[in-house]
């Protein structure tokens, strides 16, 4: 298992990035003929660096511009020591905070629901870890927002799609406020989805 750097010019693999691990641990669940693969990502942008995850490793690494790996997060307990595996994935990184989400390797095969997780944030200044729930304040009832969308680029923290029929219904029930209420007022059920972006603060590279 490794990360690959591929040339945009000709599609060649120019570099293989190996992350050491003691064995193979993966969130994929198998039960008889069933194979269930949850959605998860192993590469995340972080300013001028990249965060690389190997689900078999207890260490999450930074891949630096000079091509070297630097440890970023070391988890405890070790993934190999857990009876029920709980994986850790970064989601959004800022100057002060590292947002993450856990994923429990567990599925109820009567409902085919599972892979429950918890949202965590590490405060670099306070050296403290917290569990959190993020809400969209444009909903009166404060709809929960996930930071687990597909990684985009270093400037976009969240990219969430809101379906027009759901927004129209929420608007008619008086469940919206703020900018989202203004947008929903001009929608009908046949309108295109609304894309909500949350941008990270601007940053400058200092030499």
Put a short name on every predicted segment.
Residues 3-64:
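Loop-centered beta-sheet repeat module
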Residues 153-207:
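Blade-level signature of beta-propeller repeat domains, shared across WD40, Kelch, NHL, RCC1
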Residues 50-51, 108-113, 184-188:
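Short consensus segments that form the blades of beta-propeller domains
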Residues 1, 52-57, 100-107, 161-164:
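Beta-strand C-termini and the immediately following turn/loop, strongest in propeller blades
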Residues 12-15, 67-70, 127-130, 204-206:
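Beta-strand initiation motifs
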Residues 29-49, 87-100, 145-154:
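Structural signature of eukaryotic scaffold interfaces centered on beta-propeller domains
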Residues 2-12, 57-62, 112-128, 187-200:
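Beta-propeller blade signature
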């Amino acid at each position: 298992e490794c990360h690959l750097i591929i040339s945009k010019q000709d599609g060649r693999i120019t570099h293989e990035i190996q992350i050491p691990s003691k064995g193979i641990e993966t969130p994929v669940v198998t039960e008889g003929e069933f194979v269930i693969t949850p959605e998860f990502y192993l590469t995340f942008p972080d300013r001028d660096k990249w965060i690389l995850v190997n689900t078999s490793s207890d260490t999450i690494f930074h891949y630096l511009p000079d091509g070297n790996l630097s440890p970023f997060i070391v988890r405890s307990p070790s993934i190999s020591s857990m009876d029920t595996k709980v994986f850790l994935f970064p989601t959004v990184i800022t100057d002060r905070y590292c947002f993450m989400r856990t994923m429990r390797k567990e599925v109820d095969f009567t409902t085919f629901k599972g892979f429950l997780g918890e949202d965590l944030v590490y405060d670099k200044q306070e050296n403290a870890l917290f569990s959190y729930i993020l809400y969209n304040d444009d909903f009166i009832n404060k709809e929960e927002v996930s930071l687990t969308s597909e990684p985009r680029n270093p400037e976009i923290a969240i990219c969430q799609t809101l379906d027009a029929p759901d927004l129209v219904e929420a608007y008619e029930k008086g469940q919206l406020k703020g900018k989202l209420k203004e947008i929903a007022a001009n929608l009908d059920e046949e309108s295109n989805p609304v894309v909500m972006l949350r941008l990270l603060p601007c940053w400058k590279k200092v030499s």
